Amino acid sequence: MMKQRTIAAPVKTVGIGLHSGRKVTIVIKPAPINSGVQFVRIDTPEQSVVPATALAVCDTRLASVIQKDGVRVSTVEHLLSACAGLGLDNLLIELDGEEVPIMDGSAASFLFLIESAGIAEQEAPRQFVVIKKAVEVREGDKLARLEPFFGFKLDFTIDFKHPAVDKTGQRFIVDFAEHAYRSEIGRARTFGFAHEVEALREMGLARGGSLDNAIVLDEHRILNNEELRYEDEFVRHKILDAIGDLYLIGHPIVGAYIAEKSGHALNNALLRKLLDDPSTYEISSFAENKAPAAYSQENQPLFF
């Protein structure tokens, strides 16, 4: 039977919040079986615990924000994406501020931290959300869909009318039975447009944004001196975000995700629609030799 997994030892780092611009210390700790991923705001009087669940999402305008009893944790998607990519089920994540640090704008720093601490199997069967019937949400020309598939595959299309983006691929498909999260998705950075960044700063947001943690574009070109990490890094980052958003379902998904111009709001609406209809999914466990290849030890190895 495939087993649940957690981090083998605590690991700590410090970074800057993308929107707050404030320094945040984060500690990722092992957690018991069946506890899921939980954030702990150690800067609050009651050391408030905020579970990372789809129904806890309270804001999706600029990032995925979760809350419980008025205590918020924002910009959780990159860290959760790394957790999904490494196959972690249970974690306690302490932070002394509201916002998960942006690091370099990708999941790479979180991957490195977790791998340096190691991953430990736990004595409980790993549970999966197996998609049984297609579920779809639309908003204008935007689409997000989950459908049955014995594995985990994502097909994402973006549509940015910009010369620099047009030169790269605007669609990417990744099947994790054939490709590794770490190499194909994990290093893709967030991106934004210079005029939008200035507007956000006037609103008191994006205070921590810089060329060190995002790809920034003006009207014609990329402003960063560093080359793109992937030739189609823009759409790959949207997949990185989607993996983090989908992990708020609480378990790895066995199914295919298709998106056109989707974002945090539509991804969360998709999960809520799925949860509203129990006939669309089931919770299952797998023997190691019967599990989808996307979740095999080859694709999600242990690091001791």
From Swiss-Prot:
Pathway: Glycolipid biosynthesis; lipid IV(A) biosynthesis; lipid IV(A) from (3R)-3-hydroxytetradecanoyl-[acyl-carrier-protein] and UDP-N-acetyl-alpha-D-glucosamine: step 2/6. InterPro entries: Ribosomal_Su5_D2-typ_SF (IPR020568), UDP-acyl_GlcNac_deAcase (IPR004463), UDP-acyl_GlcNac_deAcase_C (IPR011334), UDP-acyl_N-AcGlcN_deAcase_N (IPR015870). Zn(2+) binds at residues 78, 237, 241. The keyword Lipid metabolism applies. Keywords: Hydrolase, Lipid A biosynthesis, Lipid biosynthesis, Lipid metabolism, Metal-binding, Zinc. Disulfide bonds: none annotated. One of its GO terms (cellular component) is membrane. Gene3D superfamilies: lpxc deacetylase, domain 1 (3.30.230.20), lpxc deacetylase, domain 2 (3.30.1700.10). The active site is at residue 264. Its EC number is 3.5.1.108. Its cofactor is Zn(2+). One of its GO terms (biological process) is lipid A biosynthetic process. It comes from the Bacteria. It catalyses: a UDP-3-O-[(3R)-3-hydroxyacyl]-N-acetyl-alpha-D-glucosamine + H2O = a UDP-3-O-[(3R)-3-hydroxyacyl]-alpha-D-glucosamine + acetate. The keyword Lipid metabolism applies. GO terms for molecular function: metal ion binding; UDP-3-O-acyl-N-acetylglucosamine deacetylase activity. Belongs to the LpxC family. NCBIfam families: lpxC. Catalyzes the hydrolysis of UDP-3-O-myristoyl-N-acetylglucosamine to form UDP-3-O-myristoylglucosamine and acetate, the committed step in lipid A biosynthesis. This is UDP-3-O-acyl-N-acetylglucosamine deacetylase. It comes from Polynucleobacter asymbioticus (strain DSM 18221 / CIP 109841 / QLW-P1DMWA-1).
